From Swiss-Prot:
GO terms for cellular component: cytosol. Binds 1 Mg(2+) ion per subunit. The keyword Nucleotide-binding applies. It is an enzyme of class 6 (ligase). ATP binds at residues 144, 305, 364-373, 375, 398-401, 425, 452, 458. The lineage of its organism: Eukaryota, Metazoa, Chordata, Craniata, Vertebrata. NCBIfam families: glut_syn_euk. This is Glutathione synthetase. Substrate binds at residues 125, 148-151, 214-216, 220, 267-270, 450, 461-462.
Amino acid sequence: MATNWGSLLQNEQQLEELARQAVDRALAEGVLLRTSQEPTSSEVVSYAPFTLFPSLVPSALLEQAYAVQMDFNLLVDAVNQNAAFLEQTLSSTIEQDDFTARLFDIHKQVLKEGIAQTVFLGLNRSDYMFQRSTDGSPALKQIEINTISASFGGLASRTPAVHRHVLSVLSKTKEAGKILSNNPSKGLALGIAKAWELYGSTNALVLLIAQEKERNIFDQRAIENELLARNIHVIRRTFEDISEKGSLDQDRRLFVDGQEIAVVYFRDGYMPRQYSLQNWEARLLLERSCAAKCPDIATQLAGTKKVQQELSRPGMLEMLLPGQPEAVARLRATFAGLYSLDMGEEGDQAIAKALAAPSRFVLKPQREGGGNNLYGEEMVQALKQLKDSEERASYILMEKTEPEPFENCLLRPGSPAQVVQCISELGIFGVYVRHEKTLVMNKHVGHLLRTKAIEHADGGVAAGVAVLDNPYPV
């Protein structure tokens, strides 16, 4: 995609002045992170990295991503309710991947005891890149779906004003008017509020499971503030706090510090290093409760790479979403090529394909949080090591998406403004709420655009690679 900011990106003096104005506006709007030096304190903060200009995104692909989000919500919820599918899909993975196995063990314990919760809440973000087709036109391809701790809905609500400001400074008022309004935090809070309401106790609270060191706290506060505006109170606690002060009564109602909890919202618990033995016990306690969990353990498992790969098999979508051929077609149109690495002929063929053309593939473990995927020579070495080992079942292989690079200027604290070749990743936030078997809410609630220099193969904003951006529809 060509950029219409080309001439602006060549004027170094103008860029420096614009960058100063943009940073000041970002700080004024609350596009903030705590510093890496003081991740537990808000005494000193910095702006979150962002692009100086919004990046061009084809309107048709933006509309397609929005149109399919409610289908993805339904699909995740269908996987959540299909214990047999989850068990069959993850059977080889849990033998080789300890983290997935621990999550699945909690899932089995909860099923055996009987699921206490009647309200189910999903706050998802489906991420896409724009694949360059052979004829040069871009196509929407899903990278992953995040079913736990899908972040930046708060900060993404604050960046449109920054880009409108930059374009207004340049007297580009018509262009400024094309920046889409975007407020994911409001929509995410609506989902939490609906789950809280259905829980049915006006004195109950929302519990946000937080990390001790949380640089991205302002993103979370945006959702907390939306809830407080509805007179719904949020308490922030760590897994360690739950171990010490969490309990269930005989009806499996959850209490923390003596206060009843209606909804548990996880902003922690998606990576192995976030769990001590004590934390695993706390997670089990939360899962056994009748509070609505966002996500519950089955929904977290539904977001694994292995489930994503299995959903791409012929017939799987039809089995999970019977009688919904239009939804199935919309979903399938976004799938990239995904391959199992389970032991056997199918896995052997996938490895042979990747070794023959490594630039076309990416090797993905069952991990969230960014920066875990393997590319190029690293992938080749890993596949050679894994080729004859059952450990390979803990990975999947995915066809690499190759977007058309474009120029933009990246702004980061402590670094000069940098004009580089970039690629973008578009995320769409989705919310659904189910009460027992009845779906009471299913909607898309906003978007997130992240952009990074092309030399970075993997990693998001939190991993220090990508920066916040806005789509400029063309």
